[in-house]
Each structure stands twice: as structure tokens, then as C-alpha cells.
Amino acid sequence: MLPRRLLLVGEGNFSFAASLIDGLDPSVSVTATGFQHRAALEGDPVALENLKRLRERGVEVRFGVDCTQLSHALPADDRDFDRIYFNFPHCGRKAGVAKNRELLAKFFQSCADVLAKAGEVHVTLCRGQGGTPADKPQREWHNSWQVVAMAALGGFILSDVCPFSCEAVPGYKCTGYRSQDRPFHIEGALTYIFTQSLPFESCQPRTFRVRLEDRWFYFTEPEALPGKLNRRFLEASSCHPIRTINEKLIAELGKTFPLKRLKCPLPLLSRGGPSVFLPATCDLLPTFWIRLHEDNSCSEFQNGEITQEMEEIPVSVSECTLPESPVRDGCKGAQEGICGRVKLGLRPSLLVHVEAVIHSPDFLPASLHVLSGPVFRKCHILPFMMPAFHETLFILGFDNNMKESCLPSLLGHLKDALGNLLTQTLQEGSSLGTSVEFVLQPNGKDYIIHVKSLNFGPDCAENLIIGSILTSKIVKHKHQCFVFVSINLDLLVMLAYGISDWRILWTFDNRFLKRFAPGKIEHFKSYSLYPPCYVHDVSFWVDEKKAFDELEFHTVARAVSQDTVVSVQYRDRFQHPETRQVSLCYRLTYQTCDKALTPQLAAAMQSQFRKEIQRQLHVSPR
């Protein structure tokens, strides 16, 4: 949508405003402001001529406007601008980078008061001042104006960068270099375009309700999975790229095999329900466990009065059952006893459902059964490791004597389907590419699906594991063999669309989905560029009586930071020469992919992290 209301700040001789209006539709409203008062421009014929042109076009001109206090200069009914321009900001004279950073920070904070919700802030800086990779050459961070970090203080993210073009505004003469009537060096200048970020929500986790037998319970979302439960990306009404890639993959395999799509069970498992052991390895996956609390407001919910912070997840009796209780009269002690014994886990893999699927009376041999849904597992903080993702499981059963023909056919078509999906966004003649490889495992029967992609740059040219193919007899059956193909859809989407950060798939920002055409695979262009990162170290003494759990250390970091920690690096180990006590040191890097993260907020998260590891992991900060 074209901007209808423009605000120009920091106008010196008003030549930018006078040039800009020539190319605008007459319906566009323009307000041009300058820091100087009207009297200071009397001796400048260029400025006077520009002011005359602006008056003739009906442009509102304001003098003596401080761009760091825009809400004071503009009345409440004259705000909500669609676009704010600030060209070549400068504190004046020989002000250093620190002063100019302060100017930018206060300017962005001021913009938040007068900008429309979907508005943009355009800031043009001289070559190198911004401190971003868009600058050629790029200045050292400490010697730049750190424009993206300063914008974050006002709640803004960098959404685009483009070269500043004088040809687009003929007649523009930038002045004010060192508070003199001298132009800035505009060769290589860049215009940075900022948009408002979604705010960081409070750390209060969401609450969900479940029904077991004839009783209602509630549980809170694990803090390490903020905004990950009940997102419904795979439903028919969704236009999320995860659904798009899943539908295309299923359709490709459906050209060769009869399909039977199954309704995915809910991701809640009880200790007495399906096993959380992966049949292939019998390794217990790191599972998120949740405790139920009895909901005593049943009557309110039965009347339809469901509070907004509660989300309802119905669970069938067959999936989770309550332990027998001799007391059902509402006794508090009995209720607490039952709740203490009811412990649910979030499904770590769809493979936990294979027994139920193949033993179902309507299971059809030679048909490809498809199960798709979210899974959750604790993991270390690494670029391509995710605690929540969407998985598609293909299950194919066939007679023992058909294995030699069915298995190669499935593997061949699967490889072709994956290859087609991963090459749709490549430009013709591109040297970058993606290769799919099935790597045979030591047992000689199972495979790991490797994808080597150069689309993320040389640093990410590793083999990514996007799934597995299990052909060993993980399920006992007299006359049939089974193949189970598990695909990580989130990783597949990242590779197909060129998305470098998995966290953006879970954003609540509507701009993400607007980047995609329904049903199409196109290269993703991020709306948050060059987000700043903040590094903090933490050192602590470990408890000699308890083994240090590094996985829980990562999980606490994920929970406290709301998934803003992108790296946890082990730095050092120290043993006190006298007490023999052991100390560990780790380095945490904070960075967001869709929100404005300030250094103050990152420091506050780090402070809270120190407290939480002391409380949960029983370590002593140094």
C-alpha cells in the first residue's frame, strides 16, 4: 500500500522536501520539519526558494522541531505517519560516533510515538556509518553508528537497505556537514528502512486444558517451548510454508503409491501410553514432561466461559488414562495424589505411533500411510537443532517376497521428490545447489537422509540430517516387512526456501506469511536484516555430588531467553588447586530473527539466567 502521510525531519535547506513532492501523488500529505527556526534561514536564498515551493504545494512546514521529541512538536491528532525520512543525521561540528549513536537512539524512540503501526522509518547514512554488512567496505562495529542496535532501542528492526540515489530527488542539496554550509560525502550512501517489531511478551507461559476421562486438567506450556504448542501449521486452513512443502512432498509420492492419510494423534503421551523409545535405537529421547493440575472451574467451562489465556486440547481416554482413585468426592488430598501420578510427555517423534498404525484393522499393505504432526524434544542450542519441529512419517507395509522391488522403488521416488523440492528456488545457471544422499547405517539396513546445501554459505555447507529411513524389523510381524520414512519438515522448508534461521518459522509476525504465495516455493526474503548480537559469559562452580547436565543448561538458556540465545560455547574448565572444586565457563550469544533485541534486555536475560541455573542446576556462580 502506498504511503499517504509523510514526515520529513532534520531538513536543512528543505531541498529534499521540495524535490520529493514533485514525484508524489497530490493526495499524499507531507509535513516537512527542520531543527532551525525560521529566522535562521533568512540569509539562505536556496532555502527560501524551497520554502516558497512547499507553500505553493500546500506542504505543512514546521520549524524548531527536535527529532528526538517528535511527540512534543506534533499534536496528538496529527500523527500516525506512514513514513518518516531522516537524511544524513549528525549532531553537528566534530561530534564523535558515541554522540551520533545517541542521536539515532533518541530519534528512533521518538518515532515510535508518531509512526503508524505498519509505517516505515527511512534513515540515510554516509558510507560505512551504519556498521552493517551492506556497507562496502564495512566499518568495525565499535567505530560505526550501530544503526540497527540504535533502532532496536525504539522497537524497530531493519527490513531493507538500498543505495541512496540523488537522481530520484533532483535538486536535493544536502548541507550541514560539521554544522557548515558544506555537503556530506554521499557517494556510497545507503538508505536504511526500518519497521516496527513485535514486542517481547511477558515470560508468562500459556495455559492449556485437557480432558482425561470425565475430568478436566490444565498444564502450562514448557518455558523452553514459548509459542510452540497448538500452532496448527499443518491444518487445511493454513498457508504456512510447512504445510506447502508437506503437501507437495506427499503429492509427489502419491503419483507412485496409493496414499492413505491418517489423522495425527495429539502430541501428549503418558508414561503408561505409547513408548517414547525410538524403535530403531531404543534410545530414550530427551522428552519435555509436564504435570497436570486439576481444573476446578469445570462448571464455568461447561457454560462456554473459557478464559482467553486458556487453550483447549481434548485428549481421548485411550491416549492417557487416570490412575484408579478410591476417593472421587473432590477431596483435595486425593486430587493432589492423582495429579502427582499423572505425568504427560510431549511426543518426541511420530515413530511412537507406528505400533498403533500397523496393527490397526484398516491398515492396507502396499499403500503409503502418511502421518504428519509436531514433535518436541530437548536439544542443544545449535543452528540446525530445534526443540520443536513438524515431522511427516511415511509407513509402507508389503509382503516379505516383495521387499526387493518395493524398497528400491520407494527410495528412488523419495530421492527424486526431495531433489525436486530443493531445487525449485535455484536460479538458472546458479552454481549453488543441494544434493540428497541416503547414507547406509552400520546395521546395513537403515539409512540417514543427508542433504548438503551451499545455499546458506560456506559456513553451513555441512551435511544436514533431514530424516531417516528405517527398514530393519523394528516391528515384529509374521508375513510383512515395513519401511518407515521420517522427514523433518522444518529443515526441508529451510533448505527449499533459503531460510537460515528455524526460529522464524514460529514467529507470530504476520509479515512472515505475507512473504509467501500460496502453494508456491519461492526464495524467502527476510524482513529483519543484520540483527545485532550480544555476548555474555557465565562462570560457576559445579556441585561435586551431582553430574553437570549440559543439556539442561542449554534448556534453561532457551527458556529464560525466549529462544534468543543462538550459541552456547564451552570456554574453559578450572579446578581450584586447594579445594579441588571445579568451575566451568560458557559464552552465550543473544540474537533475534524477528524482534528488536536491545543490549539492556539481553543483559537482563543473562542476569535471570544466572539465577535460574543456580536454582535449577544447583551450581554456584563465580
From Swiss-Prot:
Matching SUPFAM superfamilies: Anticodon-binding domain of PheRS (SSF54991), S-adenosyl-L-methionine-dependent methyltransferases (SSF53335)
SMART domains linked: FDX-ACB (SM00896)
Paired cysteines (S-S): none
GO molecular function: rRNA (uridine-N3-)-methyltransferase activity
InterPro entries: BMT5-like, Fdx_antiC-bd, Fdx_antiC-bd_sf, SAM-dependent_MTases_sf
GO BP term (any one): rRNA base methylation
Record domain FDX-ACB: where: 529-622
Protein name: Ferredoxin-fold anticodon-binding domain-containing protein 1 homolog
Organism the protein comes from: Mus musculus
Lineage: Eukaryota, Metazoa, Chordata, Craniata, Vertebrata
Recorded name of the encoding gene: Fdxacb1
